[in-house]
């Protein structure tokens, strides 16, 4: 049976709609009373695992799920050994550098050498500032990253932005974009090749919905 890792959170609703459009119903995950983390489609064709977004590529990489849906941001941050099969074109957001609106720094290259940047996307932030040849200290924060500059812990943050409302409410402005992110369909590379007859028809159906 096909096993699919589906992320909790912002991508869940659109992921459920996508699978419904190809004949797989995992809508029970949307029921507020649901406590199950694994459900089987009523047609008994596939089962879905409801996991944290950061864990989706882990379940796929280790072969516990043949397919998964994950944000492009996590693929760049975690660099898992998975096959990236399709851009699903939902869940749009962007990875941005932001500073307080009152900051004298209007561009990342204006940040002071060895300045501090708070982020939960440590690898993405390191790579970005490395390309700028700007030595900064990346402070890993996994809660409200916006508090970094507010409390004076950091001069800037690197974080995902969708509407920009949270930044605005906390007095922050974007000064650069690292990359844009949407949901992607991923697969376990070996499982995909060995079970092509089972998996590929579903992948084709998903791709057809995107065209």
From Swiss-Prot:
Q: Where in the cell is it found?
A: Cytoplasm
What EC number is given for this enzyme?
Answer: 2.4.2.17
Query: Cross-referenced PROSITE patterns, in alphabetical order?
Result: ATP_P_PHORIBOSYLTR
**Which is an annotated Pfam family here?**
HisG
Any one Gene Ontology cellular component term annotated for this protein: cytoplasm
What keywords appear on the UniProt entry?
A: Amino-acid biosynthesis, ATP-binding, Cytoplasm, Glycosyltransferase, Histidine biosynthesis, Nucleotide-binding, Transferase
Keyword Transferase present in the record's keywords: the answer is yes
* Enzyme type, top EC level: transferase
The pathway is: Amino-acid biosynthesis; L-histidine biosynthesis; L-histidine from 5-phospho-alpha-D-ribose 1-diphosphate: step 1/9
Q: Does the keyword Glycosyltransferase apply?
A: yes
- State where it is primarily located: cytoplasm
Q: Name one GO biological process term.
A: L-histidine biosynthetic process
Q: Name one GO molecular function term.
A: ATP binding
Which reactions appear under catalytic activity for this entry? 1-(5-phospho-beta-D-ribosyl)-ATP + diphosphate = 5-phospho-alpha-D-ribose 1-diphosphate + ATP
Family to which the UniProt record says this protein belongs? Belongs to the ATP phosphoribosyltransferase family. Short subfamily.
Report the protein's function.
Answer: Catalyzes the condensation of ATP and 5-phosphoribose 1-diphosphate to form N'-(5'-phosphoribosyl)-ATP (PR-ATP). Has a crucial role in the pathway because the rate of histidine biosynthesis seems to be controlled primarily by regulation of HisG enzymatic activity.
> What PANTHER family does UniProt report for this protein, alphabetically?
ATP PHOSPHORIBOSYLTRANSFERASE, ATP PHOSPHORIBOSYLTRANSFERASE ATP-PRTASE
Q: How does it assemble?
A: Heteromultimer composed of HisG and HisZ subunits.
Anything noted about its domains?
Answer: Lacks the C-terminal regulatory region which is replaced by HisZ.
Quote the protein name from its UniProt record.
ATP phosphoribosyltransferase
**Which species does this protein come from?**
Rippkaea orientalis (strain PCC 8801 / RF-1)
Print the organism lineage: Bacteria, Bacillati, Cyanobacteriota, Cyanophyceae, Oscillatoriophycideae
Gene that encodes it:
hisG
């Amino acid at each position: 049976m096909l096993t699919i890792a589906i992320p909790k959170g912002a991508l869940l609703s659109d992921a459920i709609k996508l699978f419904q459009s190809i004949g797989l119903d995992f809508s029970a995950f949307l029921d507020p009373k649901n406590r199950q983390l694994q459900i089987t489609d009523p047609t008994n064709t596939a089962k879905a695992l409801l996991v944290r977004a950061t864990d989706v590529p882990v379940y796929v990489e280790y072969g516990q799920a043949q397919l998964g849906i994950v944000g492009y941001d996590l693929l760049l941050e975690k660099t898992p050994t998975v096959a990236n099969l399709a851009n699903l074109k939902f869940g749009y957001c962007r990875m941005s550098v932001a500073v307080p609106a009152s900051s004298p720094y209007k561009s990342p290259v204006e940040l002071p050498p060895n300045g501090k940047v708070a982020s939960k996307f440590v690898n993405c932030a390191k790579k970005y500032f490395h390309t700028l040849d700007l030595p900064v200290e990346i402070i890993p924060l996994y809660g409200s990253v916006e508090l970094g500059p507010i409390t004076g812990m950091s001069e800037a943050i690197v974080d995902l932005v969708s509407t920009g409302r949270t930044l605005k409410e906390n007095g922050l402005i974007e000064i650069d974009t690292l990359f844009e992110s949407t949901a992607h369909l991923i697969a376990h590379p070996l499982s995909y090749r060995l079970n092509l007859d089972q998996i590929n028809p579903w992948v084709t159906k998903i791709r057809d919905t995107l065209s």
